[in-house]
Each structure stands twice: as structure tokens, then as C-alpha cells.
């Protein structure tokens, strides 16, 4: 774990190493100050003049200023090192996540990854800052202060040697009890972040179902769980300072007693006031170093769990990776599933896809329908290698998808997923995800083919209109059309529309399909839909049921051979007819009402 985290120091290694060295200089200067002060006190007691004390006093000021300079420099280098380390660590973690497949994301969950990128890295940064400065300073002060106190006070200073093990034992016991609580707290932070993420992304649904109170209670419960565990930890940590103060103050009482007795009995020959004053000063330094050490232990205990969570992500191997010698060119848009089976987890009892044998020619338009949970989306996810088949082989352009460079493959397989996602930025910037070099004319053409220009041109800023995070300021249908336009700009060899026109009307749906056919005539198109009208013009239609291909054929063939397809077609036509009838009835009623009103007005 430490080796993994240290890899993120990189270009900040010089300031990281410089910080402890500067701290060492600061501590050495600080240790001299009580010693020089004791000499000044003795000189005053012996009746030295101001002129005689000036060199010693000047040296004391010089040492104090030097200590201040070392301390200030250590503070600057420590800040640079810790902030740079956190920046690199955040960079490494984020870049690692970019290599993850869907399976890796499913393993960690998005809310947990957000916590690791934010809260956990902040904790590790704070611990790193304390380790390179305070964790160096505190032990040095402790050792040097005790050594100087012993040199000046002999057996009187041995009192400190008794309290240090007592405090160490007490601190170890507290940390032993607190550590598992912090581990539990960070797991609950994930639940808290998940609650916030769900609420913010689903705000419209929350408000439409008047679920604000429920969401408030859910968030309050998650926040209360975090609070309760933190409170338990803080209650245990609260014993630390009182325990330390009791031990150190007790030591001071004993030192005053022993020191005073020694001064009186020896009449200042074996032990004097200057030495006693220095021992007290060193005692305060020992106290401060012990308090700093306890702070370090607490911070490191918190950061230890965060560090484990971070390294868990950094050490995770992407389930999907590039081969040693990848193929960089996709020949065409042909797709072959050779007896493919797939399950999301190795421990799953049933296959999500079971023995799929399917062969699609380049340039074909394939419709895919089936009930919820029939694995339609799972099937197409294997084409872009978002998941790897458990059994069998998926080939694109005649090559096993596992032999391709991932970027090369995915650049030729444009997917408009079931969950449409837009990013913060202008409409034009979002569309250029498909092709960063697309001209304004190409952007407008793609938007026109996806029927997105119908609403974009109505915005005051047109294609420069700002899209909020997740596309929250556009409707579901508008979002779908923008995502289709984005995919069109890529001009891929394979285009997959996963229920991507469900939020648009049938007329717009038909216009989009016509645009696809004219704009990408040689592109293989796979259209997943719930409406049969969206796929009935396809070259072939696949009917999925329980992870298997139940039937394949064109529209007319399936009406004869597939009961599922026929029933779906009949029920949708019936609903459509009833809807049209209702519209006609409403129209007639409106006309009758209008005639009645006109007659009444004429009569008046």
C-alpha cells in the first residue's frame, strides 16, 4: 500500500525530502534555546552586567530567528509536497477509473468511487502532510528535549521516562478501539453520497411523485449513521487529552518537588533555579510533542482506511484490457456471435445470454425487440466490448473483438445507450464528442438528421446553449435526439440505438430512421425498440426472450411465425387505433361545441 501511494509523489519528491531536513534544523535550534536561557538566568543570578550578557542574548535571538526561518521554510515545502501529492494521487485514481470496464464500475459503485476521489484523498493528504513534518518534528523534539533535560537535571528528568510508556499504552488502546469505527464510517459515507447522487439526478421524479419528505428522511438516516459512528470515535478520542494532561502535570508536580528539594539540600551546588527552569521548558516541549504524536496517530488511523480504499482501486485490474499486439483497423461492420453465453458475475446461477448464434452482414439494419429483462442491451454491449463474453466468440469485421485495440474498436461502434447522458457544456461541445474536428455545418447536419434542430434553433443561443450537468435543462426526447446526433457525427461502421427514440413521437421516430438510412447507408445499424413501428422496416428483426434468440426474420415473416411478435404488434396497433379514435371523438366534440357557441352568439 505504501509503495503504491509513494508512486504518486513523483515530481514533488525534492520538496518532500527537503521538509524533514528543514524540520531537523528547526528542532536543533529550538533545543538550544532553553539551554542558552538557563545560562542567562545563572548569569543574572551571579550578578553579570548587561554588557556581559549581550553576546549570549544576541546569540539567543539569532538561534530563535534561525529556528523561525527553518520552520517557515518547512511549512512552505510541506504545503507544496502535500498538495502536489494529492493532485497526483487524484490524477492517478481518476485515470485508473477511466480504464475500468462496466464490470469494474459495478464492483465499486459510482458513489463509492466519488468518495474515494474526494473524502478519502483529502484524508490521505492530511496524513501525508503530518507525516513529513509533524511526525518528524514530534519524535525529534521528544528525544532531544529528554536528552537535554537529562543532561541538565539528571535523575530529576527521569520522571519523563516513566510517563512516556504510560501515555503510549493509553494511546495504543484508544487507537485499537477507534480504528474499526473509522472503517465503518467510510462505508457509511458511500451510502450518504449515494443518497445525495440519487436525489440530485432524480430531482424531477422526486418532485413529480412528491417524495421530498421521504428523500429527506433517507438522507437524514444516512447522515445520522455517519454522525453516530463519528460520535463514538470522538468519545473515545476525548480521553486522550485529559489522560495526557494528568500524566504530564503529575510529572511537573513531582519535578517541582524533587528539584526544589535538591536545590534546598545542596544550596544550589548540585541543582539550581536555571536548571529547573530549563527542565520545565523541555517538559513543555515533551508535552507538545506527545500531543502532536497523538494527533498524528488519530489522523493516520483515519487515513489508513482511506488509503486502503484508494489502493484497492489503484491495484484493481481492468477486466477488459488491450491485447499485447492489438488490431488497429476495423475492416467492416459485419458482426458475428458464435455460440456466445454471458453472465454478469462468475457466481451468478443463470446466464444473462445463453448460446447466441447470430451473423449480421455489414450494412444490414437489424431490429431487436423483446420484453424487459430479455437481455437486449446485454447483447449489444458485447459488440463494443463493454463486457467480455463468458463463452463463445464475438467478432466484428471478421476479427475477435478481444484482438482489437479498444479505442480503435469503440471508435467504429457508436452507441446511443438506454440511459442518455449529456455533459456540462454547450450543445455544440456535446455533439462534438462524436467528432472533435466536426465543422459547424457538419454539427448542424447531424442535428437535422436527428431532428434536434427543431428545438435547438428555438433556443436564443442556438448551438451555444449551455447544457447543465446530466442534461437536466432539456427534456428526455430532446436529450435522446442530441445523443443520436452525437453518434451520427462519428460516422461509425456500426451504429447501435438502444431504445433511443422511446421519448419521441412516432412521426419524429420515422424521420430519424429515414435520416439514418440516407446519411449512413453502409453502416450496420442495430435498433433496440419497444415499438414495432421503429423496427418493422429493418432487414431482419430479432425477437429476444430470456436471454435467447426466440425468432429471426423480417416483419412479414415474424407476423406469421412468432407469437410474441404478433401479439406485440396487435396490441400496439389496437392501442394506436383507440388513441386515434379518442382524438377523432374529441375533435368532433370540439366542433359541435364550437357550432353551438357560434349559434348562440348569432342568436344574441
What are these regions (language model features)?
Residues 46-49, 53-58, 148-162, 171, ...:
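Helix-loop-helix
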